């Protein structure tokens, strides 16, 4: 079980809303979100309702300002509690529809291009576990939640291009 508290103002001030489950529309509870406290669980925050828009991964901890979670604005309109998984395995492909060179990984990778010498990554098959995909190396840039399923092209995980820099397992739940 997870617990997250959203605050309208920076530094955990102003109106707040406590949550322990997925919410597809947080708009009725607060108009803006400038700070967050995660008491338990791992969460993906979304800039828009219905789990759309920019995504932000948060684990247990205090985030006194939206820039602390790499946010572009104070807009948080939906959230997803990420289920626990004990094992992680993902296949990454050089081309769309699982074509081209394929590699399977089970650990974090801070710099995919250096490790695998692909210039782009066009499809993924998440076999086990939940992962955060980052647009740039060293876990920076836009973030995308990957859950166990197939992603035949970059549009399937919500990206506008096939630029992928790093990949991290979601493991820290408490």
From Swiss-Prot:
GO biological process, one term: visual perception
GO molecular function: structural constituent of eye lens
Sorted UniProt keywords: Eye lens protein, Repeat
A Pfam family it matches: Crystall
Domain of life: Eukaryota
InterPro entries: Beta/Gamma-Crystallin, Beta/gamma_crystallin, G_crystallin-like
Region (Connecting peptide): 84-87
UniProt cross-references to SMART domains, sorted A to Z: XTALbg
Family of the protein in this entry: Belongs to the beta/gamma-crystallin family.
Function description: Crystallins are the dominant structural components of the vertebrate eye lens.
Domain notes: Has a two-domain beta-structure, folded into four very similar Greek key motifs.
Note: There are six different gamma crystallins identified in rat lens.
Name of the protein in its database record: Gamma-crystallin F
Recorded name of the encoding gene: Crygf
């Amino acid at each position: 079980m997870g617990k997250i508290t959203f605050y309208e103002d920076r530094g955990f001030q102003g109106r707040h809303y406590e949550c322990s489950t997925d919410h597809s529309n947080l708009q009725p509870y607060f108009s803006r979100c400038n700070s967050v406290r995660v008491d338990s669980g791992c969460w993906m925050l979304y800039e828009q309702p219905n789990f759309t828009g920019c995504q932000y991964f948060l684990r247990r901890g205090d985030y006194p300002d939206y820039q602390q979670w790499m946010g572009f604005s104070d807009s948080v309109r939906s959230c997803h509690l990420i289920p626990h998984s004990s094992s992680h395995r993902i296949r990454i492909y050089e081309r769309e529809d699982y074509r081209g060179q394929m590699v399977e990984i089970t650990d974090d990778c801070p710099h995919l291009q250096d490790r695998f010498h692909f210039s782009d990554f066009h499809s993924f098959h998440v076999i086990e576990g939940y992962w955060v995909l980052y647009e740039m190396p060293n876990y920076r840039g836009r973030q995308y939640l990957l859950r166990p399923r197939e992603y035949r092209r970059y549009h399937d995980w919500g990206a506008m291009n096939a630029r992928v820099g790093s990949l991290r397992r979601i493991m820290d739940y408490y």
